[in-house]
Design a protein with these regions (language model features):
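Conserved ABC transporter NBD signature motif
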Residues: 58-69, 73-74
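Conserved ABC ATPase "signature" region
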Residues: 98, 102, 109-127
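Conserved ABC ATPase signature
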Residues: 131-138
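Conserved catalytic motifs of ABC-family nucleotide-binding domains
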Residues: 152
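Catalytic Walker B motif of ABC-type/P-loop ATPase nucleotide-binding domains
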Residues: 156-159
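ABC transporter nucleotide-binding domain
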Residues: 174-270
Length: 315
């Protein structure tokens, strides 16, 4: 049984469709990256799974329990980390965690032990007596993670946990998430920092305009977006002739023309199995009398695949 599953999940806000028949499956123990532009429906999906929103229609399940009907069974097994920290004024870190531990029904010596364990896991022991509102953004995000770990949930729902963090805090958050993955947690994480997701996640989903346009492994996503690295070339004149010449070259999978401000850019996809050096592209054009004004190489990675998928190249 999947740990997270949505079936034709739809959410409307008046005339706006935030989620449009989203069908998503996440297996237990998966670290799943949720990728999409702003307004694509990522936060809405996470809030539904966190039982904070009801679907307009369709269904969402967490560990087999249906959102909206079995919320009392879902809430004890999830931890929701929004992109902000909600805290009361004049509260110490230890008081903050003890308060939420009590909300989860953790009392007495067990509560003190659990609070100590999550402080150690999130490297916040030295901040135990610090004021919550005086913490840095990175420390506050780690405190949010500590809060949701108090009751040892099966599922973590994380909405932009690295948003607004400085480089050091992002690295520390990434290492913490890796540790949670090693602990076997099922993690759904939305982020705009795609290279971090490539390091963390075993699978990704791409959502655009409320629709899921891809779900699967990272290597599968790259294959879907188009194998091979891409080379961008701009010639001074006759771009159509230059493109026609390149289409005849063995080892080139695809050649397209893209209008870019005042010039026409030639996009060339090279077959990774061909062994063709990328320098062959401008060399061949120059040998045929073309003047190359600009040349750049775009290796295939998660960011490149995302851009291709969400520009309508595949969807």
């Amino acid at each position: 049984m999947p740990m997270i599953e949505t079936v034709n999940l739809t959410r409307k806000y008046g005339d706006l469709t935030a989620l449009d028949n989203l069908n998503l499956t996440i297996e237990e123990g998966t670290c799943f990256g949720f990728i999409g532009p702003n307004g694509a429906g990522k936060t809405t999906t996470i809030k539904i799974l966190a039982t904070l929103l009801k679907p307009t229609w369709g269904e969402a399940r967490v560990d087999g329990h249906v959102v909206g009907y079995q919320n009392h069974l879902i809430r004890p097994i999830i931890g929701y980390v929004p992109d902000f920290l909600g805290a009361y004024d004049d509260m110490l870190v230890s008081e903050y965690l003890e308060f939420f531990a009590a909300c989860y029904g953790i009392h007495g010596e067990k509560r003190m032990r659990v609070v100590g364990e999550v402080l150690e896991l999130t490297d916040l022991v030295s901040k135990r007596k610090s004021d919550v509102n005086g913490l840095s953004r990175g420390m506050q995000q780690r405190l949010s993670v500590a809060r949701v770990l108090l009751h040892d949930p099966k599922v973590l729902l994380m909405d932009e946990p690295s948003s607004g963090l400085d480089p050091r805090a992002r690295i520390e958050m990434r290492e913490l998430l890796k540790e949670l993955r090693r602990m076997g947690k099922t993690i759904l994480i939305s982020s705009h920092i795609l290279f971090e997701l490539a390091e963390l996640c075993t699978a990704v989903g791409v959502v655009e305009q409320g629709k899921l346009i891809f779900s699967g492994g990272i290597s599968e996503m790259m294959d879907r977006a188009g194998s091979g690295s891409m080379v961008h070339v701009v010639v001074d004149e006759r771009p159509q002739e230059a493109a026609a010449l390149l289409k005849q070259v063995r080892g080139i999978l695809k050649v397209t023309l893209e209008r870019e401000e005042k010039v026409v850019r030639i996009d060339v996809t090279i077959d990774p199995k061909s062994g063709m050096p990328i320098s062959d592209i401008p060399s061949r054009l120059i040998a045929q009398g073309f003047r190359v004004a600009r040349f750049s190489h775009e290796p295939m990675n998660l960011e490149t695949a995302f851009m291709r998928l969400t520009k309508g190249i595949v969807s």
